[in-house]
């Protein structure tokens, strides 16, 4: 059997054995982890499945935001299409998508280890360790307490915390690095294209996976260059990066990066300049030390890469845990990547040590010791896949069903796990959402904090009215809702009208808005004079804005969504008045009345204020595909053409991958 076929056979065996190990995942629908963020990915995929092919605007989350801003496209489209084509729920489709990639990811570790070492023993050890072990549990006690079955962290965070996009990206990462290693060492056009495609797939699944890719890819370039000492290595690396970006350009726009960076402080601790400086110094020391070693004697790329990958993931994760380093995002979420780096290094070290007879007893002892945590994991291997059987009794389902049936089209404010699951079954609008990094309106976190944490009902009601919210969902202390975000859930009692009470701790209150629609005819001068509140407790500015919105002209407005990207508004406007639409402003929104384009500006709360002419009009608003996305599609098309030309000129891909 040829080497390439043997490698493919090994990968196939690893994939199918891993599938057997996680078999319940492929049959799973909704699991018992009601606090898991996988709910938001399930909800997002359901929305996409029901509104294919590609809505440009997402009106149901965050008082409206760009659909592309919510999350990278791979998992959401993969889940939606599996659900649509297989005729299954998006929850089960999500678990199938993540399960298949998880199993492929273990095979990807094999291919990465084999590509780097040309040792099947190393590759098998790395794959087995990845499927069964988590070295980080030895050094991080809180993770050990959180993972009582001692299972691998990549599976634990997938099932316990819903890190589906992250682990899917990590699963592809092994293949991407293996292809990159081969493409950097020798001119192989087909492998270079494959590397670019796989790197793009990592980024298109998750940004923590992309962070790991950026780190590992940089170390890999350096390691390969130290071995071959050819400047062309850097050109090949640039080609891979260009291909990867080009394939992502249609969604990875400049504004996407800006919004994601802007919102990072809502979901992670900001980077510390001192921590970044430490990381840069460590990188400089690593480069200097390895360069000096390479000048004295020839070095091999693979061990240099392993040492670098292990060192820098340790600086990120262990540095965050033990020394409080904040380099980029929440570094502790890179624990599965740290496991990967350490496992690859351990497999290399054990195989290298085995070649020395006097070290073989030590290797045997270490392998036996590694079996210890495997026993509890295998004994409880089905524990992470427990299905929920109480869905009809859960507030996450009951509340959303009631609102869909009794207040269709209304914007509500859920919280906690109800917020996570709010759109898993119905197209109900909420002022919050499930992916804060995609939030366009920066007033929302201030408002939601005051509503849930503040003691004063009048301030909370003012914020609800300002956001165009018709109903607020308040889980009390006895609710089955998981997070209980309200510090004073009783503050609305006797102040707001109670319209739903399940007598199990979940109450829905009606917000006293003048008209139910998200649009208002307002006095232009009064609304323009309203200022943005300085903070959540700035009652003066808040109520001045609310007064301009709710106490304006007695002119009801009819609002009809004709799709996620289109709104028809019927309004009668008098001189000196304007139309307020409580949907987040974006320059890509266009308004027309009687065939004429109308100017749109944002108000103090980030909503759309339209300069409508006097008279009765039907004003049509349409969210156009932004110019940067159209340019991105052009770049992606050119990239695909270049990739096709490279593939056409390449030899057989199968032979190139293993030479």
Outline where the language-model segments fall:
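Extracytoplasmic
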Residues: 47-52, 85, 107, 167, ...
């Amino acid at each position: 059997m040829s080497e390439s076929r043997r490698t493919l056979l090994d990968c196939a065996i690893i994939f199918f054995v891993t599938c057997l190990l996680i078999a319940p995942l492929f049959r799973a629908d909704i699991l018992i982890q009601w606090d898991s963020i996988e709910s938001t990915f399930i909800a997002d995929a359901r929305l996409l499945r029901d509104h294919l092919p590609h809505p440009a605007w997402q009106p149901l989350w965050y008082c409206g935001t760009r659909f592309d801003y919510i999350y990278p496209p791979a998992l959401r489209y993969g889940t939606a299409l599996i659900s649509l084509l297989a005729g299954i729920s998006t929850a089960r489709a999500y678990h199938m998508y993540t399960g298949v990639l998880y199993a492929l990811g273990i095979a990807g570790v094999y291919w990465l280890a084999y590509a780097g070492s040309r040792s099947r023993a190393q590759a098998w050890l790395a794959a087995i360790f990845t499927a069964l072990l988590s070295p980080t549990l030895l050094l991080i006690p809180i993770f050990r307490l959180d993972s009582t079955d001692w299972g691998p962290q990549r599976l634990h965070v997938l099932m316990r915390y819903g890190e589906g996009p992250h682990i899917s990206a990590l699963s592809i990462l092994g293949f991407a690095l293996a292809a990159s290693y081969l493409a950097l060492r020798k001119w192989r056009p087909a492998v270079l294209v494959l590397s670019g495609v796989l790197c793009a797939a990592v980024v298109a699944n998750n940004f923590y996976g992309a962070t790991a890719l950026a780190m590992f890819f940089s170390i890999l370039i350096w390691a390969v260059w130290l071995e071959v000492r050819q400047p062309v290595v850097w050109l090949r690396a640039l080609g891979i990066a260009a291909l990867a970006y080009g394939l992502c350009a249609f969604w990875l726009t400049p504004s996407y990066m800006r919004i994601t960076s802007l919102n990072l402080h809502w979901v992670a601790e900001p980077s510390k300049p001192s921590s970044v400086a430490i990381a840069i110094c460590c990188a400089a020391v690593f480069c200097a030390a390895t360069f000096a070693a390479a000048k004295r004697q020839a070095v091999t790329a693979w061990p240099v890469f392993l040492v670098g990958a292990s060192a820098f993931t340790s600086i990120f994760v262990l540095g965050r845990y033990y020394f409080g380093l904040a380099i980029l995002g929440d570094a502790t979420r890179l624990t599965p990547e740290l496991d990967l780096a350490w496992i690859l290094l351990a497999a290399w070290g054990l195989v290298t040590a085995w070649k020395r007879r006097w070290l073989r007893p030590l290797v045997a002892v270490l392998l036996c010791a590694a079996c210890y945590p495997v026993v509890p994991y295998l004994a409880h291997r089905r524990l992470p896949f427990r299905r929920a059987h109480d869905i009809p009794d859960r507030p996450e389902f009951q509340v959303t069903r009631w609102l869909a049936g009794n207040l269709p089209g209304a914007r509500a404010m859920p919280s906690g796990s109800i917020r996570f699951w709010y759109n898993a079954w119905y197209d109900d609008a909420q002022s919050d959402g499930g992916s804060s990094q995609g939030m366009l309106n920066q007033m929302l976190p201030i408002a939601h904090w005051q509503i849930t944490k503040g003691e004063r009902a009048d301030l909370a009601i003012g914020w609800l009215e300002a956001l165009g919210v018709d109903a607020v969902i308040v889980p009390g202390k006895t609710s089955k809702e998981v997070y209980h975000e309200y510090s004073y859930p009783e503050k609305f009692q006797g102040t707001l009208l109670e319209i739903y009470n399940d007598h199990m701790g979940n109450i829905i209150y009606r917000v006293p808005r003048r008209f139910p629609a998200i649009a208002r005819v307002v006095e232009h001068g009064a609304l323009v004079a309203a200022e943005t509140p300085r903070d959540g407790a700035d009652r003066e500015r808040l109520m001045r804005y609310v007064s301009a919105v709710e106490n304006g002209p007695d002119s009801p407005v009819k609002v009809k969504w004709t799709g996620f990207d289109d709104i028809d508004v019927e309004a009668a406007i008098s001189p000196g008045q304007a139309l307020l639409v409580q949907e987040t402003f974006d320059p890509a929104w266009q308004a027309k009345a009687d065939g004429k384009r109308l100017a749109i500006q944002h108000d103090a709360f980030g909503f759309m204020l339209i300069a409508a002419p006097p008279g009765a009009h039907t004003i049509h608003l349409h969210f156009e595909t932004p110019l940067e996305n159209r340019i991105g599609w052009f770049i992606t098309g050119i990239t695909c053409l270049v990739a096709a030309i490279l593939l056409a000129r390449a030899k057989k891909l199968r032979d190139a991958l293993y030479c």
